[in-house]
């Protein structure tokens, strides 16, 4: 046979070799068709196997959505992204993935949307992300511990009378423009010292601020305030502003809880501020009505209570026993090898009332879900009392056990003293003849109110709060003019810092108020009160002398 002839066995080998590496690639997916779309929702036909909360993609429009309604012959989907891009007849595909957000440490200091995409122009969020589902079951009873560790807000009125513990849910409620966001930002700023070495302020607290339906300018202001005060580096801001699609406003609080749970389940403490849940409820009402769910009271859907309860129940103090913590119900697979016990998630939800009506539908719902409320009142705010906390209507149902012993000792009568002052103040307006004991109560009440006044961005360490409240409760400010109380407080605390730093450090470290510390507070407060009282007498003498000269 000549060299140019074809050998069948060689041809067979070549074909076998070539065809052996050949693989067929067929993409299999379940597709459906958009029946109608608009206002942030789409109704799809053909996705009969879709699951609740599953992500659906619209490949031609590069838009994603989440399944919210499962009906007999169609599926209701809420749309994330460019909601106007989806129209009737478009193709939609199942992804098989539940709506999730990728979380890692590099999110701290960033502003993101509820799907984890950066909004601050600082580039992508680097590093490997742990993908966690937006919806997740709350930890069961056996995976929780009692709330016993304080979360210091740095706000005297709260830490002394309405204490918040790590793992608690404390509602901040009030009309618009009463300082609700200021309470949240001050609390976040006060956690800065937990990240500084050598401050003995407890374990670091990682913060998440969730803005729902806020103006973009408001969110930008919060970001600037946190950055200016050195608190942004331990905070994640989740922004679903009023200009964003309604579905993103609905899922934003779940995304915030998700990020907080990442820190909680890895053995750390986290704080999530929801500002505010009233707007989330409005967003959910809008979506429910568009999806033709039957409306109930105030046109909210029947499961509006469950919306907030399942969100806020995710706040918890997790059991310290690591072996038990790893068995936690609903734990995502992505966290399985990272779980550590002893973490906590504290929630500070905000509800905006209309004309002070706390008996409306959403306020009463959230009050019944949370472990207490901080009620901010318009009249107090307008009269110059900041923060404008109405002590009579505010309560902390579990935080008391988390309050440090030193604060319990000095502030045990503070709430009742203020309540009696408010009552007497109302009666005193009707008559001028008051007996000495009533006048003395009014005088002290005025000074207590003044002591609890506090400028924004000026959190007070708990040991200094103990010192100044001790002086006020024990009558050392009774003879100090009300106008001089602020100066007295500054000088008093400055003197303690300079001359008795060891006493303040001891209170911070031991959380106890010793007899020696009380003696120091008594001595310093009495000396300064005498000076201020003498100054007042001299001023009165000068006024009398001037009047005599004029006569």
Swiss-Prot record:
Q: How does it sit in the membrane?
A: Peripheral membrane protein
Q: Which Gene3D superfamilies does the UniProt entry name for this protein?
A: 2.40.30.20, ATP synthase alpha/beta chain, C-terminal domain, P-loop containing nucleotide triphosphate hydrolases
Q: Which Pfam families match?
A: ATP-synt_ab, ATP-synt_ab_C, ATP-synt_ab_N
This protein's GO CC annotations: plasma membrane; proton-transporting ATP synthase complex
Q: Give the domain of life.
A: Bacteria
Q: What Gene Ontology molecular function terms does this protein carry? A: ADP binding; ATP binding; proton-transporting ATP synthase activity, rotational mechanism
Q: What does this protein do?
A: Produces ATP from ADP in the presence of a proton gradient across the membrane. The alpha chain is a regulatory subunit.
Matching entries from PANTHER family are given as: ATP SYNTHASE SUBUNIT ALPHA, MITOCHONDRIAL
State the name under which the record lists this protein.
ATP synthase subunit alpha
**The species this protein was found in:** Salinibacter ruber (strain DSM 13855 / M31)
Q: What's the name of its gene?
A: atpA
């Amino acid at each position: 046979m000549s060299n140019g002839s074809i050998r069948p066995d060689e041809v067979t080998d070549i074909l076998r070799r070539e065809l052996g590496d050949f693989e067929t690639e067929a993409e299999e997916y379940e597709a459906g068709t958009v029946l109608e779309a608009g206002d942030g929702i789409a109704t799809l036909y053909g996705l009969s196997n879709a699951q609740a909360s599953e992500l659906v993609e619209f490949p031609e429009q590069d838009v994603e959505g989440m399944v919210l309604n499962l009906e007999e012959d169609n599926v209701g989907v809420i749309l994330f992204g460019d909601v106007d891009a989806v129209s009737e007849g478009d193709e939609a595909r199942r992804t098989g993935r539940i709506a999730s957000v990728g979380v890692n440490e590099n999110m701290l200091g960033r502003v993101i949307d509820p799907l984890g995409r950066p909004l601050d122009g600082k580039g992508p969020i680097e590093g490997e992300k742990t993908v966690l589902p937006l919806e997740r079951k709350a930890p069961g009873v056996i995976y929780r511990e009692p709330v016993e560790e304080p979360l210091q807000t740095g706000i005297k009125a709260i830490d002394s009378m309405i204490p918040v513990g790590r793992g608690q849910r404390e509602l901040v409620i009030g009309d618009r423009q009463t300082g609700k966001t200021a309470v949240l930002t001050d609390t976040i700023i006060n956690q800065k010292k937990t990240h500084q070495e050598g401050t003995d302020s407890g374990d670091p607290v990682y913060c998440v601020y969730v803005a729902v339906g806020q103006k973009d300018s408001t969110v930008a202001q919060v970001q600037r305030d946190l950055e200016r005060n050195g608190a942004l580096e331990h905070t994640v801001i989740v922004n679903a502003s009023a200009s964003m699609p309604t579905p993103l406003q609905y899922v934003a609080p779940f995304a915030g809880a998700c990020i907080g749970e990442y820190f909680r389940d890895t053995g750390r403490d986290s704080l999530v501020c929801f500002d505010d849940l009233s707007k989330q409820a409005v967003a959910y009402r809008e979506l429910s009505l568009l999806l033709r769910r039957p409306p109930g009271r105030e046109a909210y859907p029947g499961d509006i209570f469950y919306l907030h309860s399942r969100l806020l129940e995710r706040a918890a103090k997790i059991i310290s026993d690591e072996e038990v913590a790893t068995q936690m119900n609903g734990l995502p697979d992505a966290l399985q090898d990272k779980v550590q016990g002893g973490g906590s998630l504290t929630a500070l939800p905000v509800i905006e009332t209309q004309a002070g009506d706390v008996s409306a539908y959403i306020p009463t719902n959230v009050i019944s879900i949370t472990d207490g409320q901080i009620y901010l009142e318009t009249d107090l705010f307008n009269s110059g009392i900041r923060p404008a906390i109405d002590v009579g209507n505010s309560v902390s149902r579990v935080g008391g056990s988390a309050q440090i012993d030193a604060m319990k000792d000095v502030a045990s009568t503070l709430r009742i003293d203020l309540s009696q002052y408010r009552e007497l103040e109302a009666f005193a307006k009707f008559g001028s003849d008051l007996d000495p004991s009533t006048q003395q109560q009014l005088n002290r009440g005025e000074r207590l109110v003044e002591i609890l006044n506090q400028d924004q961005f000026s959190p007070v360490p708990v040991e200094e709060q103990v010192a100044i409240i001790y002086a006020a409760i024990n009558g050392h400010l009774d003879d100090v003019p009300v106008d001089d109380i602020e100066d007295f407080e500054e000088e008093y605390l400055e003197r303690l810092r300079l001359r008795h730093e060891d006493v303040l450090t001891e209170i911070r470290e031991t959380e106890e108020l010793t007899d020696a510390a009380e003696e120091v507070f008594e001595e310093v407060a009495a000396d300064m009160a005498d000076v201020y009282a003498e100054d007042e007498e001299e001023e009165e003498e000068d006024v009398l002398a001037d009047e005599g000269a004029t006569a």
